[in-house]
């Protein structure tokens, strides 16, 4: 490829050799994906930390001067944690307030002995207040009353959760409070009446619900002590790399229009995994986040309710005044045009929804390009999905969208998503047509910003 220089080729060759030596290398099977603070909280479609670690370390080998990492879709904060663990300043964006809280908790190291004392104080407070409550000497006057709370939580669970929340709120320091709220958030999901291991909101079957009687306090403390170990490892790792004053900036607004502090040509590397484009169906970020966000009093903004989260994510709201031909011409992506035409023959409404996702993604790509330094690398982990039996090669579409902003696709690496059946090895990722293949593999796009000489 005409764009490759020696550094590009070295990076590609280095990772390619690892893959050639072990074709399951990027699968990271039997690898601990819960190191450091990555264990804090589950999240839909999480990028495993070993991927972010791989891309950062490879880039540092050819560009040891890099200082600032950006993740425009930070999700659970995986790339940010790995960036800090490798001595970088990190910046992330996500419109989901639960993502913001989780990422703040995971990127905030707390001195271990200080945290240990706080945990002891909190546990004592919770157990004491629980005894007082059952003796009738403590009344909880601020029980939540959000919509359908009695459908999703049993009465005794609501009482226990609010008691724990009240004890957490006694802490003055935000860092400690955020640490505890991360454990509280995951506890909320576990002790609710939702099915276990589901990201969407489905209520338990009646026969299971009848015997469902979680010990809320013990579930919460189990997560607190688990996360304490993660904080200790993270704190020591930052000491090991000399990152004594780690810098994390979390943008709570859309990555389509970044705030002023995100300057032109500011960042050295992007490591990210964008949404698949089906947040209302397959990967329901909004449904996953809703109960935790309601308990934590998290907001998207003053006008938008938390149950509308999926509507404000990329592609969540279709522009009714869209002029399709003009949009397709502007996107300048032959693949997205072909996909739109194929889907529209079957379902025009779905075709417009798919197109809207790529319109929004293009705006994000444009803004991401603005804040990236010339010659900087970007690593995008994507998965191709199927709509109306049409396979959508998102990897190719993203490459085409980037090209008009002078960001070029250098190489693609492939990894099997563990625990899923792999489609035929020879299935081409760039073939558009009648296919119905579940997302069993991911494509890692290696891209590079080029200096615009025009």
From Swiss-Prot:
Keywords: Methyltransferase, Restriction system, S-adenosyl-L-methionine, Transferase. It comes from the Bacteria. One of its GO terms (molecular function) is site-specific DNA-methyltransferase (cytosine-N4-specific) activity. Gene3D superfamilies: Vaccinia Virus protein VP39. One of its GO terms (biological process) is methylation. It catalyses: a 2'-deoxycytidine in DNA + S-adenosyl-L-methionine = an N(4)-methyl-2'-deoxycytidine in DNA + S-adenosyl-L-homocysteine + H(+). InterPro entries: MeTrfase_CN4_CS (IPR017985), SAM-dependent_MTases_sf (IPR029063). Its EC number is 2.1.1.113. It is an enzyme of class 2 (transferase). Belongs to the N(4)/N(6)-methyltransferase family. N(4) subfamily. This is Type II methyltransferase M.MvaI. The lineage of its organism: Bacteria, Bacillati, Actinomycetota, Actinomycetes, Micrococcales.
